[in-house]
Amino acid sequence: MMFLFVSLFMFIFKWQRLIFILISLEFMMLSLFLKFSYVLGEMMFFYFMCFSVISSILGMVVMVGNMKFFGSDNCIF
């Protein structure tokens, strides 16, 4: 519950920067990961785990692509 609280506040108050959006989405994924680990079955948990890894990698690719092709683009500073 704490990860969801932190991620929602980070998403609301720091939405101008791409890196903070990606971090807040990772915290949301972590809170869902912890919540669903008790609820879902084994195969659905494996599917959700694969989805979370793929979304994390795609988020990093988007951030690196923005920094490479568009300059800083509010990614870091």
Curated annotation (Swiss-Prot):
GO biological process: mitochondrial electron transport, NADH to ubiquinone
Keyword Ion transport: no
Catalysis: reaction(s): a ubiquinone + NADH + 5 H(+)(in) = a ubiquinol + NAD(+) + 4 H(+)(out)
Keywords: Electron transport, Membrane, Mitochondrion, NAD, Respiratory chain, Translocase, Transmembrane, Transmembrane helix, Transport, Ubiquinone
One cellular-component annotation, GO: mitochondrial membrane
Taxonomy, superkingdom: Eukaryota
EC code: 7.1.1.2
Transmembrane segments: 15-37, 44-64
Lipid biosynthesis keyword on record: no
GO molecular function: NADH dehydrogenase (ubiquinone) activity
Listed result of changing residue 70 to L: In strain: CB4855
Annotated compartments: Mitochondrion membrane
Bilayer topology annotation: Multi-pass membrane protein
Gene3D superfamilies, A to Z: 1.10.287.3510
Protein family: Belongs to the complex I subunit 4L family.
Protein name: NADH-ubiquinone oxidoreductase chain 4L
Name of the coding gene: ndfl-4
